[in-house]
Amino acid sequence: MGALTESQAALVKSSWEEFNANIPKHTHRFFILVLEIAPAAKDLFSFLKGTSEVPQNNPELQAHAGKVFKLVYEAAIQLQVTGVVVTDATLKNLGSVHVSKGVADAHFPVVKEAILKTIKEVVGAKWSEELNSAWTIAYDELAIVIKKEMNDAA
């Protein structure tokens, strides 16, 4: 289990706020990165099926990516406050939705890499190993909970 320090949680919070400052741009970039890393992942998203490229200003895409980043941010705060990511109704539901959509364990490193690259681009010169580590810990701990819920739902 990976608790976060107050400093690490603050880094995640400030970079998440920068991400939120331009949701259309950053969510679009996130999905471009996901598909660069794993082109076949396109079929997992209803809003990407039948498209040749990642659509600009797509409300479903923005909402989905926004939720992903918000969940990681919330995981970071939980890790700083309690030392664990708490399983709640949202994460339980997420587990069963991911199973129904065909998400597999192998998809999690793809999302993690795209999140880290997106945040690195968002913060620019403020990127640091500590920021990378904080997002990594938060994502990894969140992924453990989601994977458990996926296994329970399967």
Swiss-Prot record:
GO terms for cellular component: cytosol; nucleus. It comes from the Eukaryota. The modification Phosphoserine is found at S46. It is found in: Cytoplasm, Cytosol; Nucleus. Root nodules. SUPFAM superfamilies: Globin-like. GO terms for biological process: nodulation; response to nitrate. One of its GO terms (molecular function) is metal ion binding. Induction: Repressed by nitrate in a dose-dependent manner. Pfam families: Globin. InterPro entries: Globin, Globin-like_sf, Globin/Proto, Leghaemoglobin-like, Leghaemoglobin_Fe_BS. The modification Nitrated tyrosine is found at Y139. The keyword Iron applies. Nitrated in effective nodules and particularly in hypoxic conditions; this mechanism may play a protective role in the symbiosis by buffering toxic peroxynitrite NO(2)(-). Nitration level decrease during nodule senescence. Heme b binds at S46, K67, H98, K101. O2 binds at H64. Residues 3-151 form the Globin domain. Keywords: Cytoplasm, Heme, Iron, Metal-binding, Nitration, Nitrogen fixation, Nodulation, Nucleus, Oxygen transport, Phosphoprotein, Transport. Leghemoglobin that reversibly binds oxygen O(2) through a pentacoordinated heme iron. In root nodules, facilitates the diffusion of oxygen to the bacteroids while preventing the bacterial nitrogenase from being inactivated by buffering dioxygen, nitric oxide and carbon monoxide, and promoting the formation of reactive oxygen species (ROS, e.g. H(2)O(2)). This role is essential for symbiotic nitrogen fixation (SNF). Belongs to the plant globin family. Monomer. This is Leghemoglobin-2. It comes from Lupinus luteus.
